[in-house]
Amino acid sequence: EIQQIVRFLGNHGIKEIELIVASSIGADLAMAFLTEIKIPVKHVFFDGGQFAQIGKATRRIMVPFLYIAMKSLYWSKGKTLKRIMWCDDDKIKPYFIEAGKNLTYGNLRRQLTDSLEDKPFSELSEELQKHTFWEFGSIEEHFKYRNAVMQTYIYGNFPVFEGFNHMQYQIQNPEGFSRM
């Protein structure tokens, strides 16, 4: 996946990235990009949820249930979103419906095999940490991982969206999020 991104950037003459925004499981791909590729990145924003650390057996057990949950979003045209997430906001339904449509069991299994691992976090340079934000919603389940992330990335920025759940601020206030 990383090499596909590198080829795409190269084919389009992109030599520097202004901002990477990564959330949930996709943040593992962003972290791999940041640690393996030498293309300069000016700013990074991570939603805190991807820093959950879940054991291998639990992740393996999660795959069929998560697969059915994600596929149900497509099959139901988004009606099951409120059962899976904290919201059923019409702004995000199309993205989840499309994700459910395109999801394959094998891809999800591979993604969870190397995501959310219970292992040390990847190293980032002091300079990149200063321009990186790890956001957590104060009421999201993954808030409990915030201290471990703060101890690893001591030069980073750690805003807390008070009273918000996982990705809730970004979805409900995209203008405020982009100003931040």
Residue ranges, per PLM feature:
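Active-site loop/oxyanion-hole signature of alpha/beta-hydrolase fold enzymes
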Residues: 1-19
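Gly/Ala-rich beta-loop-alpha elbow adjacent to hydrolase catalytic centers
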Residues: 21-30
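Short, hydrophobic alpha-helix immediately C-terminal to the catalytic nucleophile
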Residues: 30-35, 178
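Flexible "cap/lid" loop of the alpha/beta hydrolase fold
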Residues: 35-71
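Conserved alpha/beta-hydrolase catalytic His-Asp/Glu region
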Residues: 56-58, 73-126
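Conserved serine/cysteine hydrolase catalytic core
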Residues: 113-150
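Catalytic histidine neighborhood in serine/cysteine hydrolases
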Residues: 152-167
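Catalytic histidine-centered segment of alpha/beta-hydrolase-like enzymes
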Residues: 164-176
